[in-house]
Amino acid sequence: MNRLFSAVIIVIMMVIMSCSKDEATNVDCTGVAPTYIKDIAPIMNLSCAVSGCHTGIFPADGLDLSTYIKVKSASLNGKVLQSIKHQSGAKAMPRDAAKLSVDKITKVECWIQSGAPE
């Protein structure tokens, strides 16, 4: 009986641990030097700053991502990265679309880590 109980506890613990998100993953940005104009603007313009979303007179959630300055500000405070990584406590973005590719998320993360150069 004790073996069965121990086995059940171990299985439950493994299931719980496998369901947790690792939000503190480190991205290796060695040799990656994205800039806003070359790398980030195309991502934002295709996935975020589109009609009805984060652009225009009334951008979604009051967050305009249509210019370098606005994207930099939102990125440096963590909002953009949390949303595109689908972290808990943040709205998963882009809304009603597939999650951005790992490559695009890595570009954004490395861009932020390097100070968000234009």
Regions found by a protein language model. Name each.
Residues 1-19:
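Sec-dependent bacterial lipoprotein signal peptides
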Residues 19-118:
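Aromatic- and Gly/Pro-enriched helix-to-coil junctions and flexible linker segments
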